[in-house]
Amino acid sequence: MQDIRNIAIIAHVDHGKTTLVDKMLLAGNLFRENQQAGDLILDNNELERERGITILSKNVSINYKGTKINVIDTPGHSDFGGEVERVLNMADGCILLVDAFEGPMPQTRFVLQKALEIGLKPVVVVNKVDKPNCRPEEVYEMVFDLMFSLNATEDQLDFPVVYGSAENGWMSPDYKKETGDITYLLDTIIETIPAPKQLEGTAQMLITSLDYSTYTGRIAVGRIHRGTLKSGQNITIVHRNGSMEKTKIKELHTFEGMGHRATEEVCSGDICAVVGLTNFEIGDTICDFETPEALPTISIDEPTMSMLFTINNSPFFGKEGKFCTSRHIGDRLNKELEKNLALRVEMKDGSTDQWIVSGRGVLHLSVLIETMRREGYELQVGQPQVIYKEINGVKCEPVEELTINVPEEFSSKMIDLVTRRKGEMLSMEAQGG
């Protein structure tokens, strides 16, 4: 039975999360000496590299001193919140990565709050301590205050801190003492983060993410909650609505380094990919063939805004892209639905070539539009609209909740700014000082 640790990495945009994972992969001797490692290994999607953001959550695993560390890279942007919550369910602990100059930022707070609510044990990494004007000790205090304000438990507040520079490839318990590698961080992970609990019994696995392969179609990814799954085993899928379906696993894959490796059997606590299932959604449970028991499903954030997608009917039709017809665009949007969770697509009433596409926010939809454009699709998009809902016969509009933390002297300016946009102040409190 292999020793396993499942960790999620939480960080603000540009604090060096993907660089840190690169260095962890190198420490796990993932690349042969003559192999070109490259940087930003995880952000392998062109758009992610250009914008410097992680859009899709990814899984990699590192073997270190006989322990398998499954690293789950989470998107830091709240537009991809649908990705974050599902992914945290697979982890037993998290690495909170903060910049030694900037400290914890609003997006860090968003993901950290979700992680603490689930009960993950944090390890704090203060990165970029080699930069001038950095203030590692103050940042440590800020992280502690942030966790305290997010109602962390005593055990969570007793977190280890690692200082270092992912760019230069070192981590150490003291930011003044530079070491030659990042093994201190890997040792801290193995000591601090609990191993997954081994639960005996019939198999249960919650599908928390999707992978897609052009050869085998959709692949279900998740963490085995209880029991073991075997290749070729007959199973039952319990859908979110409670309906059941009998089917069979064609292949089981575990994550090894950057890729998958086929295996015969996976035990509870490990993260695996199941190949050969056809009809499944995120939030479904894979369980025993004869005695299916479903796990509680995951809630996914509802879309907040929509845009109209339609074919290009301007005089420049067909000049830029090669897929211009409504059939092409319709097929592409339906394909996107298979792996993009927080997205909704519906035909506009009475139309055959107009779709209303709803998503989490402007960034979420702009990434989809840009991806489609690069793939050679040609389309027109309308202005973003907020989504109205009818609840008990009353038309309701979405309301954003805004929390602002500022020094006292700026508070009047903030109130002025928000009230101009028809904001309504619910509470104001002074903290500290």
PLM ranges: what are they?
Residues 14, 20, 52, 71-73, ...:
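Residue-level signature of catalytic and energy-coupling elements of molecular machines
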Residues 140, 160, 184-191, 220-433:
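Accessory interaction regions appended to the cores of large information-processing enzymes
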Residues 103-119, 140-143:
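Amphipathic helical hotspot of TIR/SEFIR-family domains
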Residues 8-9, 125-133, 174-178, 207-209, ...:
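Conserved short loop/turn motifs at secondary-structure junctions
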Residues 121, 131-191:
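Canonical P-loop GTPase G-domain recognition
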Residues 1-98, 102-104, 138, 142, ...:
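P-loop NTPase switch module centered on the Walker A-proximal segment
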Residues 167, 182-221, 225-229:
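Accessory interdomain/linker segments of ATP-dependent helicases and helicase-like nucleic-acid enzymes
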Residues 30-57, 80, 146-159, 190-203, ...:
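Active-site phosphate-binding and catalytic loops of NTP-dependent enzymes
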